Structure formats: C-alpha cells, structure tokens
Amino acid sequence: MASCIREVVEALIKKLQADVTPNTVLVPINDYYEIKHTPSLLVIGPKLEENRSKRNSEKRVEVDRDNLSYTERNWPRYYHLDFDFVLTADTGAALLDLQEKGIAFFLDNREITTADASFRLVELTPIGGLERPNYSNLRQASGRYRIEDVEVFDHDVVEGKIVLYRNFRLCDFGSRRLIETYRPDE
C-alpha cells in the first residue's frame, strides 16, 4: 500500500507549482535552506498532529462477496499535516503579487485530491506581513496551512475466506436418500 502522506504532499506541491510559482519546494522542518530563485515559495513541513476524536479501536472488516472473502484490519489513524508557507520576492511589489497568488490558490482549492481520496485544505494563519530576513534585500511573507484527516493504516491485515468449503447434497425428496454430493471447489 502506498503512503497516503506522501501522495497528498506530492499532490499539494505539484498544484502549488502549477498555480502559484514553479519555484515551489518542500523543505523539512528545522532544515536550513537557501533561496536560489525569486519569486519562490518554501513549503516547510509537514508537522503531523493526530486527530484523536476520530480514533477507533474496533476492527474494520471489508467483505468481498464475489470472491467470498474478507479483509480485517484496524481502523486508520487520522493525522493533520501542518505546513508553514514562506513567500520570498526581490521587491515589496513582487511580494504583494505573490501573496495575492498564494491567497487566491487557497480560496480556489478547498481540498487536495489524490488518486484514492480528497482532503480538506484549511487556513490556520493567512499569508501576510512583510519581513526583511537576515538584513538582505529580500522580502518575505509567511502563513500556516493544514491538510486535514490524512489516513495512516498499520500493517496488521488478516485475510480469509467467508465460506471454507461448499458441499451441495442432492437428496430424493420422498425418501431423503442421498443421490449425489456436489463440490464446486474441486
């Protein structure tokens, strides 16, 4: 099973590169980075926070009636992925233009979609505030956004057959005497 966290983060980065700026990169938390091109968008994270209200200790059973089988596993844990977004530009005017693109992105995209599911995209702290980092001539603005309820499954999976064997016994209606036993699995 592919990583759901990886899929949703890759989908977010690709969408930001297409809609905001092609100079969008993902950097891990507590990593020192160097801005190589402006304008740029640094996506710092994700920082995971579990959604404990959705925690469930029961087993999840999925039945495949066509194949007469079942799959039993624990319910997934749901995590919120928090990202810090840092916009960087050469001038204040270019930063304001980039801020507008970033804000419009989050207004236009309320969810991030992968091949299997879609996840809500929530604004925690809007992008804003002009800052001058490290006494350089670059301008920066930052904000925080969240992707909610990303599923993470454990690897404890039990698969089995619903029906272990099937025998059909054909009997004479009047005497109840066995005429034939039919085994479709053989």
Residue ranges and their predicted role:
Residues K47, S57-L87:
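Active-site-adjacent structural patch at catalytic or cofactor/ligand-binding sites
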